[in-house]
Amino acid sequence: MTKLIGLTGGIATGKSTVSKLLATKLPIVDADKIAWQVEGPGQPTTQKIVAHFGQQAVLADGRLNRPWLGQLVFNDAQALQALTAITRLPIQYAMFEAIVAANQQQPDAIILDVPLLFESGWQHVCDQVLVVTASPAVVLQRLMARNHLSQQAAQARIDSQMPLAQKVARADVVIDNGANIDKTKAAVLKWLKTITK
């Protein structure tokens, strides 16, 4: 029987790197990719976001103005709550559709790559949860470099999420994705051997 494996971590811990490693053996249902589809130009969810936040929430081509929204919601808990209320159900529905589609292959497991796995309750449908970690200093540097953020802006984004220590405490498996990618690969391969036939 196919297992559902949750994959999460804090922002900039390198969860995407681990997801890519897992994708060599197992299908991935990526919540971020699904969100981009659900929140695409002209989609009902995008229209609801515009209705709530105003026209500045989209770019001229109809795509979400993600930098603007990101700055807004990472500095305003009520705005984040409103955005989540608009997007959660459409994304969850699309994810369930993707799980059903992936299960047609009858894999040993399906990876649910969900940044806010615990916050959105996905751990309840998972047989196991993998949490990707990195040190606070590494996370801060990665986020600043990746998103071109100041230290203060990067720290605000980190602080807006569930503390990584809480995610680690709830994990079945913890994968350290600090500075050494070879150790990360070894940990992922070791875990894969416990799941795949």
From Swiss-Prot:
GO terms for cellular component: cytoplasm. One of its GO terms (molecular function) is ATP binding. CDD domains: DPCK (cd02022). It is found in: Cytoplasm. It comes from the Bacteria. ATP binds at residues 12-17. Residues 4-197 form the DPCK domain. Its EC number is 2.7.1.24. Gene3D superfamilies: P-loop containing nucleotide triphosphate hydrolases (3.40.50.300). It catalyses: 3'-dephospho-CoA + ATP = ADP + CoA + H(+). Catalyzes the phosphorylation of the 3'-hydroxyl group of dephosphocoenzyme A to form coenzyme A. This is Dephospho-CoA kinase. It comes from Lactiplantibacillus plantarum (strain ATCC BAA-793 / NCIMB 8826 / WCFS1) (Lactobacillus plantarum).
